[in-house]
């Protein structure tokens, strides 16, 4: 069971999240309330049972899967909202389905402005997120220069750019630790960031308003991102604490300028971005707050 944070008024609308890939193909109603996530708290009336106990005033937020759009929701009275968080290049099919079947949802949360403008129940929402836990207990000791975390994936523009940079690093024996499932596996995400002053952060695709735990986790652990990704990232962070790159050549140049002195010159903005990142990290709470605010309008 999830750690329970109780809400004060048991009769207030409850807002819960169905975890990623947990929406069943059949019999949605059988999903246990214990399997849900409760970012804003869980009422006493819902401490046990399944989705049938939810009232028509309650709310569920889910990630997209085909059954979410097409299948019946027998015995489930709660409102259901959809949260599309992956880049358009990956979830373009779900964006198209959301336009067609938006009437099946209370709200549709997405960064895709075309989708939001085309439906009446769209709400702007960006992803963010984090892979870290117990951040205050992580020992941050910047004794190493730089890292690059990568998997073996190679289908999207960011994947390809990542591997191109890695080839360059290895060929010229540059002082950057290349780690991750595709190279040198590590146990915890923080192991690839906590001791490094810089990290080459390349999103899987470059899309407006799309940034992920790749960037958030670097900021949370006071690592300067050499960043390729959202072209409007300055809307979310103070980029004086970043090195923004738009190409392979710019990444190469940024790498050549790494130094202890440069890192120390950015400390003010590194600390500022750490605080900002803590807000962007909790995307589930932000999603639940959007639903809650809509009830008060």
Where are these regions (language model features)?
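Pol beta-like nucleotidyltransferase catalytic core
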Residues: 3-84, 88, 92-178, 182, ...
